[in-house]
Amino acid sequence: MEAIAKRLDACQDQLLELYEENSIDIHKHIMHWKCIRLESVLLHKAKQMGLSHIGLQVVPPLTVSETKGHNAIEMQMHLESLAKTQYGVEPWTLQDTSYEMWLTPPKRCFKKQGNTVEVKFDGCEDNVMEYVVWTHIYLQDNDSWVKVTSSVDAKGIYYTCGQFKTYYVNFNKEAQKYGSTNHWEVCYGSTVICSPASVSSTVREVSIAEPTTYTPAQTTAPTVSACTTEDGVSAPPRKRARGPSTNNTLCVANIRSVDSTINNIVTDNYNKHQRRNNCHSAATPIVQLQGDSNCLKCFRYRLNDKYKHLFELASSTWHWASPEAPHKNAIVTLTYSSEEQRQQFLNSVKIPPTIRHKVGFMSLHLL
């Protein structure tokens, strides 16, 4: 047990160093997935030995560590393959190479620089869904990789590989889930595209960049026949609350990148307003950490090891379960005995740039 504990500590220390470094080098992210793989192997072995805890860390069930290990192997192999091509020298962030991004439609390919497309179903301003059009999509074709861009038309969102068009969002299928009249309007930038059933004229096609180019990596010539034309359906995106309906107006979607670096966020509104509220005299000061689940676990381990005197309690990692949740990140909540202790924590502890943190109060009475 002692040998496993030492190797696990070293592995998690290296993971946290990688998170704090926040590199854009693809080889650092390959190392990151190697560490995740080793961590899963150690936890799997510990569970087979009958251990339920290693220090403060709970040993997960065998199926959990096995699945996580398989995911790490998958990501490591694909990143190593991509690193050998001309695209390996491009900047790659932890978010770009995360397993969550890997499974984001279109699934099992790398993607960068996402822009939002809003689709209004049944002409209802309150029934608007958001989808992502990617500026760069990296597809594996046998031993080589190709880089394409995605576009949107009245049918859905697609990318073109060679002469084959693949839809990864089908608006007709989405309309069957979120609408009742099989009518939708696509708002992209300052352009509105209506569903084929609502117009008789030819629907205009919009691309997010220049005309789609088929750019194979220089390692080996790709085989176009490997690209499929199966329609993919995305997971239900977040539904946005809309204001009152406005007729005969041009629909303008705010374009924002989902691939930008996330900076630390500390809200100071409580300094201006909430401190004046007497109800906070009985509330518990907290800091809410948001980010990758494994990154949060490593960071919490370091906090318990080196900074336990700067906070009271640390929660397990948790997620919002509602489909309307504002994000899918894991969350860890830290509590403090006073606002002064919390401020001392924020002044003393370096929070990795991949973790967002917000301050607030918890009105529940802790036992």
Swiss-Prot record:
Subcellular compartments: Host nucleus
Post-translational modification: Phosphorylated.
Protein name: Regulatory protein E2
Reported function: Plays a role in the initiation of viral DNA replication. A dimer of E2 interacts with a dimer of E1 in order to improve specificity of E1 DNA binding activity. Once the complex recognizes and binds DNA at specific sites, the E2 dimer is removed from DNA. E2 also regulates viral transcription through binding to the E2RE response element (5'-ACCNNNNNNGGT-3') present in multiple copies in the regulatory regions of the viral genome. Activates or represses transcription depending on E2RE's position with regards to proximal promoter elements including the TATA-box.
Pfam families: PPV_E2_C, PPV_E2_N
Region (DNA-binding domain): 283-367
Family: Belongs to the papillomaviridae E2 protein family.
Region Disordered: start-end pairs: 225-246
